[in-house]
Structures are given as structure tokens and as C-alpha cells.
């Protein structure tokens, strides 16, 4: 018996891709703020050429998560997870939380020059 798809995988993929997209700029600032230092922090810039790919993956994953969460679904049978009223509301809350974090992560490289 397989578990129904509910958008969790797309939310996870979108969040991970956004983190990877901003790793070249956000990573060094976070590490320095935590007290880490060293020349190896500069190696995180090796991810910069892949940033557009990660941005695309994040946005596509968020689109599929949005589609899965907000598209009308088939009727739920009693006893299934989707029949519990709090579950769809929780998924929507998590989706918008991840969407905000993705937008922050995607916009951070443009704001980071003001911190250095």
C-alpha cells in the first residue's frame, strides 16, 4: 500500500535547491557569523556557475508543490490522512513558509554586498 503523494517531496526539493542556489553567497556569511574562518570558505564560490540551475529547480519544485497542494483532489475516504481537516491547512502553512525561505535564499546574493 503506497502513501498518497501530497507535495512533501516537491517542498523538500524546492527548499534544498534554494539553499544550494544561495550557498555561494549565504554560506560564507553564515560561517563567518558563526565564528568559522579560513581560506577554504572561498571554495564555496565554486557553486556560483550552478546557481541558475538551482534557482530553476527550486522554482519548478515549488510550482509542483503548489499544484499538488492547491489543486482539487479526489474525495478522501474516512480514516485517510487527507480527511483530517488540519492536514491540508498544515501543508499550506509549510508550503508558504518554504516559499518565503526560498525567496529569501534566492534574493540574498543581491543583498549580501551590503554586509561586506
UniProtKB/Swiss-Prot annotation:
Report the GO terms under cellular component: plasma membrane
Q: Name one GO molecular function term.
A: metal ion binding
Its keywords, alphabetically, are: Cell inner membrane, Cell membrane, Membrane, Mercuric resistance, Mercury, Metal-binding, Plasmid, Transmembrane, Transmembrane helix, Transport
UniProt topology in membrane: Multi-pass membrane protein
Compartmental location: Cell inner membrane
Give a yes or no for keyword Transcription in this entry. Answer: no
Matching InterPro entries, A to Z? Transprt_MerT (IPR003457)
Coarsely, its chief localization is membrane
List the Pfam families: MerT
Q: Which parts of the chain span the membrane according to its record?
A: 16-36, 46-66, 94-114
List of residues binding Hg(2+): 24-25, 76, 82
**Among its keywords, does the record have Membrane?**
yes
Q: What functional role does this protein have?
A: Involved in mercury resistance. Probably transfers a mercuric ion from the periplasmic Hg(2+)-binding protein MerP to the cytoplasmic mercuric reductase MerA.
Query: Belongs to which family?
Result: Belongs to the MerT family.
Mind telling me what this protein is named?
Mercuric transport protein MerT
The species is Pseudomonas fluorescens
